[in-house]
Amino acid sequence: MATPPAAGVIALKPIAHAKSRLAVPDPLRRRLAWTMALDSLAALSRALPHVLVVSDQPALEAELRRAGIAVDVISESGHVGINSALSRGAQVIRAQGFATVVACVGDLPALRPESVLRVLEASRPHRRSFVADASGVGTTMLLAHDVDLAPQFQGRSAAAHHASGAESLSAEEIGSPIADARRDVDTEADLAVAIGLGVGLATDALVDHETGWLGRYELITATQWCDADGEQLVVTSSGRRIVLPVAALGNELRHARVGQRLHSVEAEGRVLSAWL
């Protein structure tokens, strides 16, 4: 009988409390936490047949599906902290018949599906293995084949995982440096590296490609006016009129109602992305 394929698990904490070290306006920080989670989940979902999210946010599954991410979400059910949440997710995955669990952090905006598959293949000789982050101190992925996941994320997690018996997967074993799978994001410097590697669609929508950095955050109000090309105009909090292309509304908004206030990032007088 063929070995069942691997399944992935990610634990997501409320966006309001995520990425507190990013020195950007709070609405943009929250948006970045969301888009990075979306890009991490999108890559994992393209590589694996099943992905489970563990969270205490009741509306999260519906929000993810509206964003185009079809994954199952289960409650933390009193399992406080990332390690308890991941352990709960791993138990559910095993009960569903999957022999291999791939636990991943939710702040890998540059993650590519092929890197996930490379890591999965390199992990086969080991019961438990992990991918250290770019600093070598933390962990971005932990894999377990037919054994307990026993996650030790947060802090000096690479050393903790190694001490627990998990093997650190090297670039030589993987066959690639997989910089995208090691670049988690906590600071602006981390984000700059991730953008340089190439981030997923959700995070990329916030990037001004002329500068290679985030667009400028603006709180905008939709108006009834349009420019010469028929595109809707919005007014910034400082009174400037800028263009709101339909494409900037993404999956969350079909249109901006007159008088509606939105968060946004803009560049050169055009909104790059807008959200509620």
Predicted features by range, described:
Residues 110-136:
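Conserved donor-nucleotide/metal-binding helix-loop-beta segment in metal-dependent transferases, i.e.
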Residues 33-49:
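A short, N-terminal amphipathic alpha-helix
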Residues 162-214:
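Conserved alpha/beta core of the MobA/IspD/sugar-nucleotide pyrophosphorylase nucleotidyltransferase superfamily
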Residues 65-101, 157-159:
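Short phosphate-binding loop-to-helix
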